[in-house]
Amino acid sequence: MKNSFGMVSKDKMAEAARPFLERVGLDVDPNEFVGRLSIGQQQMVEIAKSFSLNAKILILDEPTSSLSEKEVDVLFDTVRDLKKQGMGIIFITHKMAEVFQLCDAVTIMRDGEFMGERQSAECSESELISLMVGRDLGNYYVRTYNKPGDIMMEVKNINAGKRAIDCSFQVRSGEILGFYGLVGAGRSELMKAIMGLDPMDSGEIYLNGEKTKKHDPAYMQKHGIALVPESRKTEGLLLNNTIKFNTTLAVLDRFIKNLVVNTRKEDEITEDGIEKLHIKTPSSLVNCSTLSGGNQQKVLLAKWLATDPKILILGEPTRGIDVGAKAEIYTIINNLAKQGLAIILISSEMPEVMNMSDRMMIMREGHIMGELSHDEYDQERILKYAMGVSNNE
């Protein structure tokens, strides 16, 4: 695709790219930077790229983990069209609904081993889950409801650009407060503003009844708040470093004095996390990149639990992990609440928030649209709040 001077021609490249983009229904300028596109659009660019390679088989690895519902619908329509055109699709997912919605046949794997193959029209969700985890999980949401204690954090009228607009809420010890919303609702952005990771335009934060004097991550961590980010691979862990390195990264001051490392204390912190969270590993010196998604998530939890938080903010804690690992994470969350931690659970999976939280805040476009207690939970009502539809309609 060179011009008459032997140089790469951007115009010719754009012209060649257009039919591939049109084939996946992507209406964007071929000269646009990929980094400026939404995650869903980036996913479509990857698929369009496969056409330019004349691919006959397309492998999609957890393609919906960061997509909005609208983007998922577009992706599924594209996959169905590709199937009609004769392309073979390998669709890797942990989400049961996607298996039955999209796939003809299902291959189940566990710990690197082939566990079985089924026709999706001839099997049930419980059968697949049993094959995936090696046992019948029943209801794998683990939640013991206790009366919440004192208010641990109160947020008043937080404003942070368009990410958070006049947001107020409180969370108590022993309580799991759920934050639900569609992708882009502002849940994670609000928590980052509270934590001091993003600038806050106005508002007040009270911890144990006292107004915070500063607004930065070090101050908030020192006063008992820990934020477990939603992306363990890009924000949470240094995957090419060891479990020990990652687990102790947030508490270096506990075992490093005058540039001298107290290796015994470092080992104690690491082994405590491995034991309490049942991290499956032959050694704390194993790189996190070699672990399963579930065990990576446990390492990330161990990292922030090592700071001894009183308030734990969990961003999408079960994203991209299998149902067995999810059940283990739910047990951990439930036990932490029983121990008195105030937990804020951010999730885009409605069943997760409904089954694990005591109360729920629903967000849309930076606004808190509604608050529901557990006995008020109703899927239709929650979705109306999330979509900005009046519950009186």
Regions found by a protein language model. Name each.
Residues 1-393:
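Glycine-rich phosphate-binding loops of nucleotide-dependent enzymes
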